[in-house]
Amino acid sequence: MTARMHGARSLARAVAALAAMAAPALAAPEASDVWSDLREGLEAYGYAVEAGTEEVGGDAVRLEDLVLSTETRGETMGPDGEMAASVTRITLTLARAGLTEEGDGVVVTLPDEIPIAIETEVEGADPVVLRGRLRSEGLDVAVREAEAGLRYAYASDVQTFELDEFEGSEGTLDLAIRLEAFAGETLTGRAGTDRTTTQSQRADRATAEVQFVDPSPDGGSIDLAFALADLVGTGETRVPEGAAIADPGLTARAGGRIAGDVDYGDTRLEIAVDGPGGALDVSSTSAGGALNLSLGADGIVYGLQTEGSAVRLRGEQLPIPELSYTVERSALDVLVPILAGDAPQPFRIAAALTGLDLDDAIWDLFDPRAVLPRDPASLDVALSGNATVPEDLVAPPPGEDAPTPGADAPSGEDGDAGEDAPAPELVELDVERLDLSAAGARLSASGALSAVEGGTPAAPGLPPLAGTLAIDLTGVEGLLDGLVEMGLLEPERSAFARGMLGFVARPTGADAYASEITLGGDGSVTANGMALR
């Protein structure tokens, strides 16, 4: 399964490489200059470019047997669940391609059908090979001059990818991806010697269908159908000379940047699983969302938002025939520094789950008499701070020193490379907010903590920290009463919990408490000035 997922990511890179055929250029839009720049752009994606026949003359460039190939080495999950050396090779073959000067621009002509082969080798596993075809209907690509470089405009009625062959597994795999009413524009230029691009793209609809069947006695099948509407994407890249988008680590080290945002409308996901344990059907819809990703010297930023989600599960192994729930909004925002440095670097992680509303059938499993309030639950967490990064968190550029499946990997004193690599060290942690509400109770917290050099951790697994957290609790006594009434909590344990609550917190109202937890850095912990440790 891991190899197949690895192949899917490789397919995305292959499609991105084809998009580059309708992207970067620098000089005036003459056919030969555009072709030279297209080659440079493909190489920026990590592809080797070889043409069986290349004719440059007059106002046109004609290419035959154009082969784009790339090889990526690294590590992925092996068949035994451990990290293993891997190599992925992608090959695209274009029977013919051409660039022709027409009017005030250059028209790029690509085949209606392009074969793609993706081969993945993972140490200890059989190679996995995917072969398919990328097809375009009504594809138009035109290149014209812009103030700061070149403007590439491209559009197609339909773009599809269909899998023809799947080798390396006893099962069978069918895969079809479809993009409708796709259009976009790319502006290219230079910032010094750095290559820059600015892109905007949109599509009316995208769909994917996947079917996998394992014929073994303990096997089964998975059917997946996914659709989303109204895709709108924007992106920017700044790639220093000698770097490549295919190697984001090198790009970041050289001061480059890669960023992209995608907004989308209604989505639908249908999954049907059938196996020895029975059948399971999952359906999910949402009213839309957004995805953003960027990488640069300041780190990796990842953001995800989803609005109006609804999930339904049906299956023989479920405790009831159907489980369902809705979520008003979910979001994730993460910044992770990736380059080594002596100075502290900022990080953040924020997650929100608003309006989690469980269907009554789920509530009835553990609370059939509706003792607890069934209001939607919510979670909102935002943490930020600074940390030092002793070693790069991104892999070095792949090349001669990259691991190869079946070859001896470099080892340290203990025989395992990377096991003793120092982890990032926390310097400051700011708990901007922590807000959890469910079943009529609510917990809120905020505060700031700092690492103490040479101090004593307050708990195993934590660095020595000093600082204060302010905590507010409401509805806890009502929750304890409800759990006792439901028979989920013994009265003695409820009494003990109330006693601890009175010890570490002070009452601020009816079923409301507040507490200040202070860490001393020397291992001491106090609550409202009273020593806990």
Regions from the language model: what does each represent?
Residues 2-27:
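Gram-negative bacterial Sec-dependent N-terminal signal peptides
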Residues 28-533:
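Glycine-rich, small/hydroxylated-residue low-complexity segments
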